[in-house]
Amino acid sequence: MGIYSEREVQAVPMTFKRRWTDEAIRALVDQDKGLIDPRIYADQDLYEIELERIFARSWLLLGHEAHIPKTGDYLTTYMGEDPVIMVRQKDGSIKVFLNQCRHRGMRICRSDAGNAKAFTCTYHGWAYDIAGNLVNVPYEKEAFCDKKEGDCGFDKADWGPLQARVETYKGLIFANWDAEAPDLKTYLSDAMPYMDVMLDRTEAGTTVVGGMQKWVIPCNWKFAAEQFCSDMYHAGTMAHLSGVLSSLPPEMDLTQVQMSKNGSQFRAAWGGHGSGWFINDAAILMAVMGPKITQYWTQGPAAEKAAKRLNQMPTQTMFGQHMTVFPTCSFLPGINTIRSWHPRGPNEVECGPSWSSMPMRPEDIKEEFRRQNIRTFNAGGTFEQDDGENWVEIQRGLRGHKAKSAPLCAQMGLNVPNKSNPDFPGKTAYVYAEEAARGMYHHWARMMSEPNWETLKP
Protein backbone atom coordinates (compact mmCIF):
# COMPACT_ATOMS: atom_id res chain seq x y z
CA MET A 1 0.00 0.00 0.00
CA GLY A 2 1.03 3.62 -0.51
CA ILE A 3 1.83 6.05 2.27
CA TYR A 4 -1.70 7.51 2.31
CA SER A 5 -5.01 6.15 1.11
CA GLU A 6 -7.11 8.36 -1.17
CA ARG A 7 -9.48 9.05 1.74
CA GLU A 8 -6.57 10.14 3.93
CA VAL A 9 -5.18 12.38 1.20
CA GLN A 10 -8.51 14.16 0.72
CA ALA A 11 -8.81 14.70 4.48
CA VAL A 12 -5.41 16.38 4.92
CA PRO A 13 -6.10 19.98 6.05
CA MET A 14 -4.24 22.71 4.20
CA THR A 15 -3.14 25.40 6.63
CA PHE A 16 -1.03 28.48 6.00
CA LYS A 17 0.33 31.24 8.18
CA ARG A 18 -2.00 34.19 7.62
CA ARG A 19 -1.77 37.91 8.20
CA TRP A 20 -5.59 38.08 8.28
CA THR A 21 -7.22 36.87 11.50
CA ASP A 22 -10.81 35.65 11.45
CA GLU A 23 -11.82 38.71 13.47
CA ALA A 24 -10.14 41.05 10.98
CA ILE A 25 -11.91 39.36 8.08
CA ARG A 26 -15.31 39.75 9.74
CA ALA A 27 -14.64 43.47 10.13
CA LEU A 28 -14.28 43.89 6.34
CA VAL A 29 -18.07 43.71 5.85
CA ASP A 30 -20.63 45.51 8.02
CA GLN A 31 -24.08 44.56 6.80
CA ASP A 32 -25.83 46.63 9.48
CA LYS A 33 -24.12 49.85 8.37
CA GLY A 34 -23.86 48.87 4.70
CA LEU A 35 -20.07 49.17 4.50
CA ILE A 36 -17.63 47.13 2.40
CA ASP A 37 -13.86 47.35 2.71
CA PRO A 38 -12.50 47.58 -0.87
CA ARG A 39 -9.50 45.45 0.05
CA ILE A 40 -11.73 42.39 -0.37
CA TYR A 41 -11.44 42.92 -4.14
CA ALA A 42 -7.68 43.32 -4.40
CA ASP A 43 -5.80 41.66 -1.55
CA GLN A 44 -3.71 38.62 -2.52
CA ASP A 45 -3.77 37.09 0.98
CA LEU A 46 -7.55 37.36 1.17
CA TYR A 47 -7.74 35.71 -2.23
CA GLU A 48 -5.67 32.74 -1.02
CA ILE A 49 -8.13 32.33 1.86
CA GLU A 50 -11.02 32.48 -0.62
CA LEU A 51 -9.59 29.54 -2.54
CA GLU A 52 -9.49 27.46 0.64
CA ARG A 53 -12.59 28.54 2.52
CA ILE A 54 -15.00 29.49 -0.26
CA PHE A 55 -14.07 27.64 -3.44
CA ALA A 56 -13.03 24.44 -1.66
CA ARG A 57 -16.24 24.37 0.42
CA SER A 58 -19.05 25.72 -1.79
CA TRP A 59 -21.21 24.00 -4.38
CA LEU A 60 -19.86 25.24 -7.72
CA LEU A 61 -21.65 25.11 -11.07
CA LEU A 62 -19.67 23.12 -13.65
CA GLY A 63 -22.08 22.61 -16.53
CA HIS A 64 -25.36 21.18 -17.78
CA GLU A 65 -26.21 17.50 -18.11
CA ALA A 66 -26.74 18.12 -21.83
CA HIS A 67 -23.02 18.91 -22.14
CA ILE A 68 -22.13 15.25 -21.43
CA PRO A 69 -25.03 13.06 -22.62
CA LYS A 70 -23.09 9.86 -23.51
CA THR A 71 -20.77 7.52 -21.64
CA GLY A 72 -17.25 8.94 -21.76
CA ASP A 73 -18.39 12.46 -22.65
CA TYR A 74 -16.36 14.96 -20.65
CA LEU A 75 -15.97 18.66 -20.03
CA THR A 76 -12.91 20.24 -18.45
CA THR A 77 -13.44 23.28 -16.27
CA TYR A 78 -12.43 24.67 -12.88
CA MET A 79 -13.40 24.69 -9.23
CA GLY A 80 -11.78 27.90 -8.10
CA GLU A 81 -8.35 27.62 -9.70
CA ASP A 82 -8.29 23.83 -9.52
CA PRO A 83 -8.71 22.23 -12.97
CA VAL A 84 -11.27 19.42 -13.01
CA ILE A 85 -12.77 16.89 -15.42
CA MET A 86 -16.52 16.22 -15.43
CA VAL A 87 -17.27 12.81 -17.01
CA ARG A 88 -20.40 10.79 -17.78
CA GLN A 89 -20.03 7.25 -16.39
CA LYS A 90 -21.20 3.91 -17.79
CA ASP A 91 -24.09 3.77 -15.32
CA GLY A 92 -25.25 7.27 -16.30
CA SER A 93 -23.87 8.95 -13.20
CA ILE A 94 -21.39 11.82 -13.30
CA LYS A 95 -17.96 12.01 -11.72
CA VAL A 96 -15.81 15.07 -11.17
CA PHE A 97 -12.14 14.74 -10.33
CA LEU A 98 -9.02 16.85 -10.27
CA ASN A 99 -7.41 17.20 -13.69
CA GLN A 100 -4.02 16.29 -12.27
CA CYS A 101 -1.76 13.29 -12.62
CA ARG A 102 -0.69 12.03 -9.21
CA HIS A 103 2.87 11.45 -10.42
CA ARG A 104 4.14 14.99 -11.08
CA GLY A 105 0.94 16.99 -11.30
CA MET A 106 0.54 17.34 -15.07
CA ARG A 107 -3.00 17.66 -16.42
CA ILE A 108 -4.34 14.35 -17.62
CA CYS A 109 -6.72 16.00 -20.11
CA ARG A 110 -5.81 19.09 -22.11
CA SER A 111 -8.96 19.38 -24.26
CA ASP A 112 -11.99 21.50 -23.39
CA ALA A 113 -14.49 18.74 -24.14
CA GLY A 114 -14.88 15.46 -25.99
CA ASN A 115 -15.38 11.74 -25.50
CA ALA A 116 -12.77 9.42 -24.04
CA LYS A 117 -12.25 5.87 -22.82
CA ALA A 118 -9.28 6.94 -20.70
CA PHE A 119 -7.13 9.95 -19.85
CA THR A 120 -3.37 9.67 -20.29
CA CYS A 121 -0.81 12.06 -18.88
CA THR A 122 1.40 13.35 -21.69
CA TYR A 123 4.43 13.65 -19.39
CA HIS A 124 5.11 10.07 -18.22
CA GLY A 125 2.14 8.16 -19.59
CA TRP A 126 0.19 7.35 -16.45
CA ALA A 127 -3.34 6.45 -17.59
CA TYR A 128 -6.67 6.82 -15.78
CA ASP A 129 -10.09 5.42 -16.69
CA ILE A 130 -13.18 7.64 -16.93
CA ALA A 131 -13.94 7.06 -13.25
CA GLY A 132 -10.54 8.47 -12.29
CA ASN A 133 -8.89 5.18 -11.39
CA LEU A 134 -5.20 4.82 -12.20
CA VAL A 135 -5.10 1.83 -14.56
CA ASN A 136 -1.69 1.87 -16.20
CA VAL A 137 1.83 2.94 -15.20
CA PRO A 138 4.56 2.41 -17.81
CA TYR A 139 7.34 0.12 -16.55
CA GLU A 140 5.52 -0.30 -13.26
CA LYS A 141 7.38 -3.46 -12.17
CA GLU A 142 10.76 -2.18 -13.24
CA ALA A 143 10.27 1.26 -11.70
CA PHE A 144 8.83 0.34 -8.32
CA CYS A 145 10.64 -2.88 -7.45
CA ASP A 146 12.92 -5.52 -8.87
CA LYS A 147 10.49 -8.39 -8.39
CA LYS A 148 9.33 -10.18 -11.48
CA GLU A 149 6.21 -11.37 -9.66
CA GLY A 150 4.30 -10.45 -6.54
CA ASP A 151 3.53 -7.25 -4.69
CA CYS A 152 5.78 -4.29 -5.47
CA GLY A 153 4.41 -2.19 -2.62
CA PHE A 154 2.83 0.21 -5.12
CA ASP A 155 -0.98 0.10 -5.25
CA LYS A 156 -2.53 1.98 -8.17
CA ALA A 157 -5.77 2.29 -6.18
CA ASP A 158 -4.01 4.80 -3.92
CA TRP A 159 -3.05 7.13 -6.74
CA GLY A 160 -6.22 8.27 -8.46
CA PRO A 161 -6.95 12.02 -8.75
CA LEU A 162 -8.89 13.66 -5.94
CA GLN A 163 -12.65 13.19 -6.34
CA ALA A 164 -15.32 15.84 -5.70
CA ARG A 165 -18.89 15.35 -4.55
CA VAL A 166 -21.37 15.72 -7.42
CA GLU A 167 -25.07 16.59 -7.30
CA THR A 168 -27.46 17.98 -9.89
CA TYR A 169 -30.37 20.38 -9.78
CA LYS A 170 -32.79 20.37 -12.72
CA GLY A 171 -30.10 19.82 -15.33
CA LEU A 172 -27.32 21.85 -13.70
CA ILE A 173 -24.26 19.97 -12.44
CA PHE A 174 -22.63 21.16 -9.21
CA ALA A 175 -19.57 19.84 -7.39
CA ASN A 176 -18.05 20.36 -3.95
CA TRP A 177 -14.70 19.27 -2.48
CA ASP A 178 -15.89 19.37 1.13
CA ALA A 179 -17.27 16.13 2.57
CA GLU A 180 -18.76 18.04 5.51
CA ALA A 181 -20.67 20.63 3.47
CA PRO A 182 -24.48 20.39 3.39
CA ASP A 183 -26.09 18.63 0.45
CA LEU A 184 -26.92 20.70 -2.62
CA LYS A 185 -30.64 21.23 -1.95
CA THR A 186 -29.92 22.34 1.61
CA TYR A 187 -27.28 24.68 0.22
CA LEU A 188 -29.70 26.17 -2.34
CA SER A 189 -32.62 26.22 0.10
CA ASP A 190 -35.03 29.12 -0.43
CA ALA A 191 -33.26 30.18 -3.63
CA MET A 192 -34.67 27.19 -5.54
CA PRO A 193 -38.04 28.76 -6.50
CA TYR A 194 -36.17 31.67 -8.09
CA MET A 195 -33.92 29.27 -10.02
CA ASP A 196 -36.98 27.37 -11.19
CA VAL A 197 -38.26 30.43 -13.08
CA MET A 198 -35.68 29.50 -15.71
CA LEU A 199 -35.00 25.81 -15.06
CA ASP A 200 -38.43 24.29 -14.45
CA ARG A 201 -40.88 26.01 -16.79
CA THR A 202 -41.76 22.74 -18.54
CA GLU A 203 -41.80 19.08 -17.54
CA ALA A 204 -39.09 18.45 -20.15
CA GLY A 205 -36.75 20.91 -18.43
CA THR A 206 -33.99 22.69 -20.32
CA THR A 207 -31.27 21.88 -22.78
CA VAL A 208 -28.19 23.68 -24.10
CA VAL A 209 -28.35 25.56 -27.39
CA GLY A 210 -25.25 26.49 -29.33
CA GLY A 211 -21.69 26.18 -28.11
CA MET A 212 -19.91 27.40 -25.02
CA GLN A 213 -17.77 30.49 -24.70
CA LYS A 214 -15.01 31.51 -22.31
CA TRP A 215 -13.31 34.86 -21.86
CA VAL A 216 -11.14 36.60 -19.28
CA ILE A 217 -11.97 39.93 -17.60
CA PRO A 218 -9.32 41.79 -15.57
CA CYS A 219 -11.49 42.29 -12.49
CA ASN A 220 -12.28 40.59 -9.20
CA TRP A 221 -14.83 37.77 -9.39
CA LYS A 222 -17.07 39.36 -6.74
CA PHE A 223 -17.97 42.33 -8.95
CA ALA A 224 -19.53 39.98 -11.49
CA ALA A 225 -21.20 37.74 -8.91
CA GLU A 226 -22.65 40.69 -6.99
CA GLN A 227 -24.10 42.37 -10.08
CA PHE A 228 -26.05 39.26 -11.01
CA CYS A 229 -27.04 38.78 -7.36
CA SER A 230 -28.34 42.23 -6.49
CA ASP A 231 -27.72 45.00 -9.01
CA MET A 232 -30.69 45.96 -11.15
CA TYR A 233 -29.68 49.56 -10.37
CA HIS A 234 -26.99 49.67 -13.07
CA ALA A 235 -29.44 48.56 -15.76
CA GLY A 236 -31.81 51.40 -14.94
CA THR A 237 -29.19 54.15 -14.86
CA MET A 238 -26.09 54.49 -17.03
CA ALA A 239 -24.33 51.16 -17.53
CA HIS A 240 -26.29 49.76 -20.46
CA LEU A 241 -27.04 52.86 -22.53
CA SER A 242 -24.98 51.58 -25.47
CA GLY A 243 -26.60 48.16 -25.33
CA VAL A 244 -30.11 49.58 -25.15
CA LEU A 245 -29.38 52.09 -27.91
CA SER A 246 -28.17 49.35 -30.24
CA SER A 247 -31.45 47.49 -29.71
CA LEU A 248 -33.78 50.37 -30.52
CA PRO A 249 -35.52 50.69 -33.89
CA PRO A 250 -34.39 53.68 -35.99
CA GLU A 251 -37.45 55.78 -35.16
CA MET A 252 -36.76 55.66 -31.37
CA ASP A 253 -34.15 57.34 -29.16
CA LEU A 254 -33.16 56.99 -25.51
CA THR A 255 -35.55 59.72 -24.36
CA GLN A 256 -38.41 57.36 -25.23
CA VAL A 257 -37.08 54.53 -23.03
CA GLN A 258 -38.22 54.59 -19.41
CA MET A 259 -36.91 51.93 -17.05
CA SER A 260 -39.27 50.67 -14.39
CA LYS A 261 -39.20 51.78 -10.76
CA ASN A 262 -41.41 48.89 -9.66
CA GLY A 263 -39.72 45.67 -8.66
CA SER A 264 -38.35 43.47 -5.92
CA GLN A 265 -35.24 41.59 -4.96
CA PHE A 266 -34.69 38.42 -2.95
CA ARG A 267 -32.06 37.70 -0.30
CA ALA A 268 -31.53 34.09 0.73
CA ALA A 269 -31.94 33.39 4.43
CA TRP A 270 -28.58 31.60 4.30
CA GLY A 271 -25.98 31.12 1.63
CA GLY A 272 -25.44 34.51 0.01
CA HIS A 273 -27.76 33.83 -2.95
CA GLY A 274 -29.81 36.66 -4.42
CA SER A 275 -32.07 37.75 -7.25
CA GLY A 276 -33.93 40.82 -8.53
CA TRP A 277 -36.62 41.62 -11.09
CA PHE A 278 -39.04 44.26 -12.33
CA ILE A 279 -42.78 43.77 -11.87
CA ASN A 280 -45.32 44.17 -14.69
CA ASP A 281 -42.92 46.07 -16.92
CA ALA A 282 -41.24 44.30 -19.83
CA ALA A 283 -39.16 47.25 -21.07
CA ILE A 284 -35.81 45.79 -20.06
CA LEU A 285 -36.55 42.34 -21.49
CA MET A 286 -37.79 43.93 -24.71
CA ALA A 287 -34.63 46.03 -24.97
CA VAL A 288 -32.38 43.00 -24.57
CA MET A 289 -34.24 40.16 -26.30
CA GLY A 290 -36.73 41.78 -28.67
CA PRO A 291 -40.47 41.21 -29.12
CA LYS A 292 -40.48 37.51 -30.07
CA ILE A 293 -38.77 36.28 -26.90
CA THR A 294 -40.56 38.81 -24.70
CA GLN A 295 -43.95 37.62 -25.92
CA TYR A 296 -42.98 33.95 -25.57
CA TRP A 297 -41.70 34.47 -22.01
CA THR A 298 -44.61 36.56 -20.75
CA GLN A 299 -47.71 35.78 -22.84
CA GLY A 300 -49.38 32.94 -24.66
CA PRO A 301 -49.67 29.19 -23.99
CA ALA A 302 -46.04 28.57 -22.96
CA ALA A 303 -46.05 31.38 -20.40
CA GLU A 304 -49.44 30.29 -19.05
CA LYS A 305 -48.29 26.68 -18.62
CA ALA A 306 -45.14 27.85 -16.86
CA ALA A 307 -47.20 30.01 -14.51
CA LYS A 308 -49.38 27.04 -13.56
CA ARG A 309 -46.37 24.79 -13.08
CA LEU A 310 -44.53 27.38 -10.98
CA ASN A 311 -47.56 28.41 -8.96
CA GLN A 312 -45.40 29.45 -6.00
CA MET A 313 -44.08 32.32 -8.13
CA PRO A 314 -46.11 34.94 -10.06
CA THR A 315 -43.86 34.39 -13.06
CA GLN A 316 -45.96 36.35 -15.54
CA THR A 317 -45.30 39.53 -13.55
CA MET A 318 -41.49 39.05 -13.39
CA PHE A 319 -39.32 40.75 -16.01
CA GLY A 320 -35.56 41.07 -16.44
CA GLN A 321 -34.70 38.70 -13.60
CA HIS A 322 -31.06 38.34 -12.58
CA MET A 323 -29.61 35.84 -10.09
CA THR A 324 -26.45 34.50 -8.46
CA VAL A 325 -26.13 31.26 -6.55
CA PHE A 326 -23.17 31.99 -4.28
CA PRO A 327 -20.40 32.12 -5.02
CA THR A 328 -20.12 32.03 -8.81
CA CYS A 329 -23.19 30.61 -10.59
CA SER A 330 -25.00 33.46 -12.35
CA PHE A 331 -27.86 33.57 -14.84
CA LEU A 332 -30.57 35.73 -16.36
CA PRO A 333 -34.02 34.08 -16.66
CA GLY A 334 -35.81 35.35 -19.75
CA ILE A 335 -32.49 36.02 -21.42
CA ASN A 336 -31.39 32.52 -20.42
CA THR A 337 -27.67 33.02 -20.33
CA ILE A 338 -25.92 31.06 -17.59
CA ARG A 339 -22.28 31.04 -16.56
CA SER A 340 -19.69 30.38 -13.88
CA TRP A 341 -17.11 32.91 -12.73
CA HIS A 342 -13.70 31.27 -12.24
CA PRO A 343 -11.23 33.40 -10.25
CA ARG A 344 -7.75 33.94 -11.62
CA GLY A 345 -6.17 35.79 -8.73
CA PRO A 346 -7.70 38.83 -7.05
CA ASN A 347 -7.53 40.93 -10.23
CA GLU A 348 -8.88 38.61 -12.92
CA VAL A 349 -11.82 36.32 -13.57
CA GLU A 350 -12.59 33.84 -16.33
CA CYS A 351 -16.19 33.81 -17.45
CA GLY A 352 -17.08 30.38 -18.66
CA PRO A 353 -18.26 28.11 -19.72
CA SER A 354 -21.08 30.46 -20.63
CA TRP A 355 -24.02 29.00 -22.49
CA SER A 356 -27.69 29.44 -23.32
CA SER A 357 -30.08 27.21 -21.40
CA MET A 358 -33.34 26.83 -23.27
CA PRO A 359 -36.70 25.11 -23.08
CA MET A 360 -36.68 21.81 -24.94
CA ARG A 361 -38.98 23.25 -27.58
CA PRO A 362 -40.01 24.84 -29.92
CA GLU A 363 -37.06 25.06 -32.30
CA ASP A 364 -37.72 28.59 -33.55
CA ILE A 365 -37.72 29.89 -29.97
CA LYS A 366 -34.46 28.09 -29.19
CA GLU A 367 -32.89 29.64 -32.26
CA GLU A 368 -34.11 33.11 -31.31
CA PHE A 369 -32.69 32.73 -27.79
CA ARG A 370 -29.37 31.64 -29.28
CA ARG A 371 -29.26 34.54 -31.73
CA GLN A 372 -30.14 37.18 -29.16
CA ASN A 373 -27.63 35.81 -26.65
CA ILE A 374 -24.89 36.12 -29.26
CA ARG A 375 -25.87 39.75 -29.77
CA THR A 376 -26.14 40.71 -26.09
CA PHE A 377 -24.57 38.44 -23.46
CA ASN A 378 -21.40 36.72 -24.61
CA ALA A 379 -17.78 37.67 -25.21
CA GLY A 380 -18.72 40.09 -28.00
CA GLY A 381 -22.19 41.01 -26.78
CA THR A 382 -23.17 44.64 -26.37
CA PHE A 383 -24.47 44.30 -22.81
CA GLU A 384 -21.60 42.04 -21.75
CA GLN A 385 -19.07 44.64 -22.86
CA ASP A 386 -20.91 47.39 -20.97
CA ASP A 387 -20.63 45.37 -17.76
CA GLY A 388 -17.03 44.35 -18.31
CA GLU A 389 -15.83 47.89 -18.95
CA ASN A 390 -17.14 49.07 -15.59
CA TRP A 391 -15.67 46.14 -13.67
CA VAL A 392 -12.27 46.60 -15.33
CA GLU A 393 -12.14 50.32 -14.54
CA ILE A 394 -13.02 49.64 -10.90
CA GLN A 395 -10.19 47.12 -10.64
CA ARG A 396 -7.72 49.53 -12.21
CA GLY A 397 -8.58 52.11 -9.59
CA LEU A 398 -7.99 49.60 -6.81
CA ARG A 399 -4.31 49.37 -7.74
CA GLY A 400 -3.81 52.56 -5.74
CA HIS A 401 -3.30 52.93 -2.00
CA LYS A 402 -5.94 55.56 -1.19
CA ALA A 403 -8.54 53.81 -3.35
CA LYS A 404 -8.47 50.94 -0.84
CA SER A 405 -8.45 53.14 2.27
CA ALA A 406 -12.12 54.17 2.57
CA PRO A 407 -15.19 51.90 2.75
CA LEU A 408 -17.59 51.52 -0.15
CA CYS A 409 -21.31 52.23 0.27
CA ALA A 410 -23.84 49.38 0.24
CA GLN A 411 -26.58 51.27 2.11
CA MET A 412 -29.38 51.40 -0.46
CA GLY A 413 -32.58 50.28 1.23
CA LEU A 414 -31.18 50.37 4.78
CA ASN A 415 -33.16 53.45 5.79
CA VAL A 416 -36.20 52.79 3.62
CA PRO A 417 -39.38 51.48 5.29
CA ASN A 418 -39.86 47.76 4.83
CA LYS A 419 -40.78 47.05 1.22
CA SER A 420 -40.99 43.28 1.36
CA ASN A 421 -43.31 41.81 -1.25
CA PRO A 422 -45.65 39.10 0.06
CA ASP A 423 -46.32 37.87 -3.48
CA PHE A 424 -42.84 36.31 -3.57
CA PRO A 425 -41.33 33.68 -1.27
CA GLY A 426 -38.52 34.33 1.19
CA LYS A 427 -37.02 37.63 2.29
CA THR A 428 -37.64 40.34 -0.30
CA ALA A 429 -36.93 44.06 -0.60
CA TYR A 430 -37.25 46.89 -3.10
CA VAL A 431 -35.57 46.21 -6.44
CA TYR A 432 -33.14 49.13 -6.04
CA ALA A 433 -32.23 48.20 -2.48
CA GLU A 434 -28.96 46.38 -1.85
CA GLU A 435 -30.37 43.75 0.48
CA ALA A 436 -29.14 40.85 -1.63
CA ALA A 437 -25.68 42.40 -1.94
CA ARG A 438 -25.43 42.80 1.82
CA GLY A 439 -26.50 39.18 2.16
CA MET A 440 -23.86 38.02 -0.31
CA TYR A 441 -21.01 39.89 1.38
CA HIS A 442 -22.17 38.89 4.86
CA HIS A 443 -22.07 35.25 3.81
CA TRP A 444 -18.68 35.81 2.15
CA ALA A 445 -17.33 37.12 5.47
CA ARG A 446 -18.81 34.19 7.37
CA MET A 447 -17.29 31.59 5.08
CA MET A 448 -13.95 33.38 5.17
CA SER A 449 -13.88 33.58 8.98
CA GLU A 450 -15.66 30.39 10.08
CA PRO A 451 -13.64 27.27 9.19
CA ASN A 452 -16.05 24.90 10.95
CA TRP A 453 -19.39 23.82 9.48
CA GLU A 454 -20.75 23.43 13.01
CA THR A 455 -21.09 27.21 13.21
CA LEU A 456 -21.50 27.93 9.50
CA LYS A 457 -24.16 25.42 8.49
CA PRO A 458 -27.75 26.58 7.78
UniProtKB/Swiss-Prot annotation:
Pathway: Xenobiotic degradation; biphenyl degradation; 2-hydroxy-2,4-pentadienoate and benzoate from biphenyl: step 1/4. [2Fe-2S] cluster binds at residues 101, 103, 121, 124. Fe cation binds at residues 234, 240. It catalyses: biphenyl + NADH + O2 + H(+) = (2R,3S)-3-phenylcyclohexa-3,5-diene-1,2-diol + NAD(+). Residues 59-157 form the Rieske domain. Its cofactor is [2Fe-2S] cluster; Fe cation. It is an enzyme of class 1 (oxidoreductase). It comes from the Bacteria. SUPFAM superfamilies: Bet v1-like (SSF55961), ISP domain (SSF50022). Binds 1 [2Fe-2S] cluster per subunit. Keywords: 2Fe-2S, Aromatic hydrocarbons catabolism, Dioxygenase, Iron, Iron-sulfur, Metal-binding, NAD, Oxidoreductase. Its EC number is 1.14.12.18. Heterohexamer consisting of 3 BphA1 subunits and 3 BphA2 subunits. A ferredoxin (BphA3) and a ferredoxin reductase (BphA4) must be present to obtain activity. This is Biphenyl dioxygenase subunit alpha. It comes from Pseudomonas sp. (strain KKS102). The lineage of its organism: Bacteria, Pseudomonadati, Pseudomonadota. The gene is bphA1.
